[in-house]
Amino acid sequence: MKTNCEFPLLCLLIVLVANVEGEVEDNELKMVKRLWRNWEDPEQRQLLDQEAEQEKQREKRLWRNWEDLELRQLLNEFAENQREKRLWRNWERRQVANEDDGEKPKELWRNWEDLKRRQVVDLNDEQKTTG
């Protein structure tokens, strides 16, 4: 029989004291005696120890899972903060770039016009030399 009595001597003492005072029925005393016999039995004690060890391992695993979850949440919050900072910096850079945009398009347009003029001149020069 599997039991969860981790301290059989304490269980036995409580029942014996209660029995002396006449507060324990025979069924309870039989149960404690059975617990004690199970505890004295090496195989039964080994099973109880294994169950206790499995429960400890389960608790450790649950704790690690909880810690992992907490860590993941912290990392996600950190990543989100970093993403927000990066988006903000990019937005600020675009604002600064947009302030300069008044001259940039004009300069780009002038460069494009110059390029087209040079292409026309080069084309005319080619036609003169071949023609």
Swiss-Prot record:
Main location: secreted
Coiled coil: none
Tissue-level expression: Expressed by the venom gland.
GO molecular function terms noted in the UniProt entry: toxin activity
GO cellular component: extracellular region
Endpoints of the signal sequence: 1-22
Similarity section: Belongs to the scoloptoxin-08 family.
Protein name: U-scoloptoxin-Er5e
Lineage: Eukaryota, Metazoa, Ecdysozoa, Arthropoda, Myriapoda
